[in-house]
Amino acid sequence: MGVIQAIDRLMTNPIPDGQVDDILRPQGESPLLQKGYVTTSVDALLNWARTGSMWPMTFGLACCAVEMMHAGAARLDLDRYGIVFRPSPRQSDVMIVAGTLVNKMAPALRKVYDQMPDPKWVISMGSCANGGGYYHYSYSVVRGCDRIVPVDVYVPGCPPTAEALVYGILQLQKKIWRTQTNAG
């Protein structure tokens, strides 16, 4: 099975035929379910909605940004999974930092992160964003964007493939699904 087929298998409904998807239903039998009502908790509903419509803001700084654009192109087409790249931090909930972060760009990264509405998540893409990469010992390079903003998922590679970014997004969706909100 190729990488594209594995990603499609993960993003489509992994439940075997004949079983019901229980994202919004509790375990076991309930008289409410027999009458056609769906019961769930507010946390489960919010996390389900957040994982299905992630809107990343691109923060491309170097060659990793080319692979990030490749992930949004026709071959992988993140749009069909509900992942739509947004141009403004006020419209996005995920930031993808791709490339070498230099000291002059660090305040801009923090300012853009602060403009994003809560809840917000960060994906660090590539060796340079993760820890400085090839330019680690340069005086002008920040040794990892996690020194500036909190990072939720690290995608390794120099540059990482578009499939690796999609896998990182899937891992972020799993992380969002496991989180508890303070709603309700």
Curated annotation (Swiss-Prot):
Disulfide bonds: none annotated. The keyword Signal does not apply. It comes from the Bacteria. [4Fe-4S] cluster binds at residues 63-64, 128, 158. GO terms for biological process: aerobic respiration; electron transport coupled proton transport. Binds 1 [4Fe-4S] cluster. The keyword DNA-binding does not apply. Its cofactor is [4Fe-4S] cluster. It holds the Pfam family Oxidored_q6. Its EC number is 7.1.1.-. It is a peripheral membrane protein. It is found in: Cell inner membrane. GO terms for cellular component: plasma membrane; respiratory chain complex I. GO terms for molecular function: 4 iron, 4 sulfur cluster binding; iron ion binding; NADH dehydrogenase (ubiquinone) activity; NADH:ubiquinone reductase (non-electrogenic) activity; quinone binding. InterPro entries: NADH_UbQ_OxRdtase-like_20kDa (IPR006137), NADH_UQ_OxRdtase_20Kd_su (IPR006138). NDH-1 shuttles electrons from NADH, via FMN and iron-sulfur (Fe-S) centers, to quinones in the respiratory chain. Couples the redox reaction to proton translocation (for every two electrons transferred, four hydrogen ions are translocated across the cytoplasmic membrane), and thus conserves the redox energy in a proton gradient. NDH-1 is composed of 14 different subunits. Subunits NuoB, C, D, E, F, and G constitute the peripheral sector of the complex. Belongs to the complex I 20 kDa subunit family. This is NADH-quinone oxidoreductase subunit B. It comes from Xylella fastidiosa (strain 9a5c). The gene is nuoB.
